[in-house]
Amino acid sequence: MKASEEEYRLNFFIKNDFKRKICKSCKTPFWTRDEKKEYCSDIPCTDYYFFDINIKSQPLTVKEAREKFLSFFEKRGHTRISPKPVLARWREDLYLTIASIVDFQPHVTSGLVPPPANPLVVSQPSIRLEDIDNVGITFGRHLTTFEMAAHHAFNYPDHYVYWKEETTAYATEFFTKELGIPEEELNFKESWWEGGGNAGPCLEVTVGGLELATLVFMQYKITDNGNYTPLKLKIVDTGYGVERIAWITQKTPSAFHAIYGNLVYKFFNKIGVAYIDETLLKVASRFAGKIDPDNPDTIKIHRQMVSKELGIDIKAVEEELDRAAKVFQILDHTKTIMLMLADGLVPSNSGEGYLGRLVIRRALKVLRLLKSDVRLYELVKEQIDFWKEDFPQVLKNKDYILDAVELEQQRFEKILEKVPSIASTLARKSEITTEDLIQVYDSNGIPPDLLEEELKKKSVKFELPRNFYALVAKRHQTSTIKSAYDKVKLPKDMLEYITALQPTEKLYYKDQYMRSFEGKVLGVYKNYLILDKTTFYPEGGGQLGDTGLIIDEKSSKRYEVIDTQKVNDVIVHILKEEPSTIKVGDNVRGEINWERRYRLMRHHTVTHVILAAAKKVLGEHVWQAGAEKTPEKGRLDITHHKTLTEEEVKLIENYANSVISDRRQVKPLEMNRMEAEMKYGVSIYEGGVPNSATIRLLEIKDWDIESCGGTHVSNTSEIGAVKIINVERIQDGVIRLEYVAGPALVDYIRETQAKIVEASKIIGTSPDQLTSRLRRILNEIEEKNNLIIQYRRIIETELLNNLKPYEINGNKIYIIEGLGDEEENKEILRKLTSTDNTIAISISDNRLQIATSKNMRVDKIVEELLKGGGKGGGKGTFANVILNSKKSKEEIIEIVRKSL
């Protein structure tokens, strides 16, 4: 959609002598006080010429630029609020905080929840990976991490705050009065913004080739069919670039110098790259506005312009600028890595962890291309020391950040050992596509740049996409939200039936210990029953739905409830049979299976206890990745970068049992969503993100507070005790803890004791002697195994000395009877085929192992063998085959003869 000219024809512009002009280059309308201006002052229409503008402000660091912006708006009636983490954990559809408006999506922008203040001002650290491949090349125009300083106003139908006129006036005052930019240099470029399902006209503020801010006026919702409908809530969504404000006041040759100061020189030194010639850098930066990274020709033209201007050989210019760009990339990426990990990201192969690993591996790749020996964690440590006052969480989580980065580098180095074999596989393809390269990266973690050299050795050419990492990041930057209907275990016809029913009153929130109740029937459909109120808890938050009885008060007939589910606010009781005596309007009595429910309450409560204990032992990066509470046990999946040690498990268990022994109060709270976020942070959403203005929190006194809709005990002492019974790494970056509490712990102890007694009987000893007896048995087994190995070596030697080969066309074919051990057979076959033109086959019933010498291939032999029926295969010089029927030596020799 394109807005009309009237959307931008503001009284502010008219009163302050701004003229509407059309840019001579891009043909975009813009507003300026300079009547002679022909260009919009944005690149690529102009070069960077802000270096030449007389700006009255003293040079500002990033910290000073941030504070100047926040203070300016604070003095003008805006409430300063704290930024959110760079991980958007209050959103289920987005992994990273890409802009300040994300702080308020979807619940504030939809009108469900009021903002924390109105108007407000914030400086939000943000991460965008869509430009990751462009970082460094444009001298700081593109970054993966940046601070979006923003003032927001939320205009309701009955409450106007401010809109376009005031927003434009604020921007003009800030840039001209606060920063001292000459009024004639300030331009407002007409544009259109869309994002997150919303849209609106916007003005881009440009000065000297640099876009300093975007003023968005969010006023439309984009419908599913692509139409635009007006929003009831009209939002001022601004974004000022803190780093660009610092850059324009410092006038450094790159934004990296303005952002990182002396850290730039330190990185060049640590990485082992000579610092770029200052004159070359200044000239290259001035012409950098001409670079469109998506068009490689513009990069080439830029380098030619620099070469011509300085009279330097083009190759020397390219080499020096390429090296500098790589160092700038590492500066940018290490800050992004630091912020991601400080806010709790655990590198992995999925979700937000995938994006973190992508940035880490890109930084490692660049270091490798620069042939640098510096460890990545050393550079991240420099970033922590530099930013620790701006972002206190980076210092608090320093140990985890550095440990995770070093572990990732070790894993990456191990992965690179696969490069030759992966390159060999790719080399066999007739054409290597971008999709092939993405598949290799996703499956093996190998960047295509590092495959390039290996493929060149094989004379294989392929086109490496310039935006490779952006393409990969785009595929992984969002997650799919399931609707309430997708999450429940109910048939479609049942979901349609309940749409007209009123919400169910949740008695289990009024009294979690209520065991029975009376309710009125609102709906009966097959074996599904809906009441006006219930104390049956529906499955949710990892807690199983309640079971029990529904009693028809007229006939006294009892119906077993086998499960309870919820769709939106309607609770559905699933009965074992259709309730033939119950109809709509009847009164019924409900009784929950209390023993089962109480077990679930204990396991649900102890899950909160263990999660907080894990954070205390392992670090603040621990985040709930999943949970399940059954009557038999609890299960908690947590994010962590390493396998847990026995000592760590013991500490988690000890902390949990200490909290149980402390008899701490467990109390549910209801709070306004934004108030809860401001008070406790987004960690309250560990168990999921509820879609409501008011959220239910569970507080364990002085231990944990988290959003949770489950049922819990009222005091930790009711849990009794907890035992962690299993710990395993279920996927990259995720550890699963299983545990039992209360009566389930007693059951576990009984079962374990029974197994110990049974094991003791089997080996003929008493339970107290079981350990020592097992050690003796294991020692005996080890001794016997050593004897077996010795005997096998004797047999192997005898076999190799006495075995006579068959001769076929100058090839030797050995046939041996299998020894019953596949690895032993494989070793013998390997020795037999150590010389050229040799085939060795081990036969064990209808199973064959086939090996050939290095100058032969096994494929044709396997193909010939399988003609008679069977399965199997292999590659290169070894294969396993299972035939449909056993064959004699003579038959196998004949088959081999045919294959040769």
From Swiss-Prot:
Spans through the membrane: none
Signal peptide (residue range): none
Catalytic activity: tRNA(Ala) + L-alanine + ATP = L-alanyl-tRNA(Ala) + AMP + diphosphate
Principal place of residence: cytoplasm
Residues engaged in binding Zn(2+): H604, H608, C708, H712
Thylakoid as UniProt keyword: no
Entry keyword set: Aminoacyl-tRNA synthetase, ATP-binding, Cytoplasm, Ligase, Metal-binding, Nucleotide-binding, Protein biosynthesis, RNA-binding, tRNA-binding, Zinc
Gene Ontology molecular-function annotations: alanine-tRNA ligase activity; aminoacyl-tRNA deacylase activity; ATP binding; tRNA binding; zinc ion binding
CDD domains referenced in this protein's UniProt entry, alphabetically: AlaRS_core
EC number: 6.1.1.7
Enzymatic class: ligase
UniProt remark on cofactor binding: Binds 1 zinc ion per subunit.
Cellular localisation: Cytoplasm
GO annotation, cellular component aspect: cytoplasm
Cofactor(s) the record lists: Zn(2+)
Oxidoreductase is among the record's keywords: no
GO annotation, biological process: alanyl-tRNA aminoacylation
Pfam families in UniProt: tRNA-synt_2c, tRNA_SAD
InterPro entries referenced in this protein's UniProt entry, alphabetically: aa-tRNA-synth_II/BPL/LPL, Ala-tRNA-lgiase_IIc, Ala-tRNA-ligase_IIc_anticod-bd, Ala-tRNA-synth_IIc_core, Ala-tRNA-synth_IIc_N, Ala-tRNA_lgiase_arc, Ala-tRNA_ligase, Thr/Ala-tRNA-synth_IIc_edit
Domain topic, free-text comment: Consists of three domains; the N-terminal catalytic domain, the editing domain and the C-terminal C-Ala domain. The editing domain removes incorrectly charged amino acids, while the C-Ala domain, along with tRNA(Ala), serves as a bridge to cooperatively bring together the editing and aminoacylation centers thus stimulating deacylation of misacylated tRNAs.
Similarity remark: Belongs to the class-II aminoacyl-tRNA synthetase family.
Its biological purpose: Catalyzes the attachment of alanine to tRNA(Ala) in a two-step reaction: alanine is first activated by ATP to form Ala-AMP and then transferred to the acceptor end of tRNA(Ala). Also edits incorrectly charged Ser-tRNA(Ala) and Gly-tRNA(Ala) via its editing domain.
Name used for this protein in its record: Alanine--tRNA ligase
Record organism: Saccharolobus islandicus (strain L.S.2.15 / Lassen #1)
